[in-house]
């Protein structure tokens, strides 16, 4: 499981022109699920994302975790793209939707995140703050 975590001042997700989720200051998490990922992996990664100290404290140093700030999570199987052969990426490194969706939902629930629409074509808008963008792999969580 991989989480691309972006510190944002705001973010939103729309499907078919309809707004389905929006947050103010917090994190936008693009989440990819791999074959073999488990509920335990989802829980550990969500806890790790929540604990990342990527917000500024009173002294302007990145020293605070998510806390009461908001989170928005979007499923992103393309985080497991394989570009080693030619110019067309392969996605066999990502879990099939029927295995990935319950783990995505579990991760979002544990993180307390608003959600995009799993498997849908979405328009994601964000204002990156910093910018701060961090890739967290479950193997290191």
Label the predicted regions.
Residues 19-68, 81-109, 114:
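Compact, glycine-rich, soluble single-domain proteins
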Residues 7-15, 21, 36:
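N-terminal intrinsically disordered, cationic/polar leader segments
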Residues 77:
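Glycine/small-residue-rich phosphate/adenosyl-binding loop
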Residues 22, 135-141:
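Compositionally biased, non-globular sequence tracts
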Residues 45, 74, 132:
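Residue-level signal for inorganic ion chemistry
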Residues 124-137:
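C-terminal edge-of-domain segments
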């Amino acid at each position: 499981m991989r989480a691309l975590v972006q510190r944002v001042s705001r973010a939103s997700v729309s499907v078919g022109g309809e707004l389905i989720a929006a947050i103010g200051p917090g994190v936008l998490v693009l989440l990819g699920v791999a074959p073999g990922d488990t509920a335990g992996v989802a829980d550990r990664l969500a806890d790790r994302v929540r604990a990342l100290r990527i917000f500024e404290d009173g002294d302007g140093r990145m020293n605070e975790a998510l806390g009461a700030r908001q989170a928005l999570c979007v499923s992103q199987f393309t985080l497991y793209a394989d570009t080693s052969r030619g110019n067309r990426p392969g996605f066999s490194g990502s879990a099939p939707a029927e295995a990935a969706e319950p783990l995505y939902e579990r991760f979002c629930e544990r993180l307390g995140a608003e959600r995009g629409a799993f498997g849908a074509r979405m328009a994601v808008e964000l204002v990156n703050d910093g910018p701060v963008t961090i890739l967290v792999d479950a193997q290191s969580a």
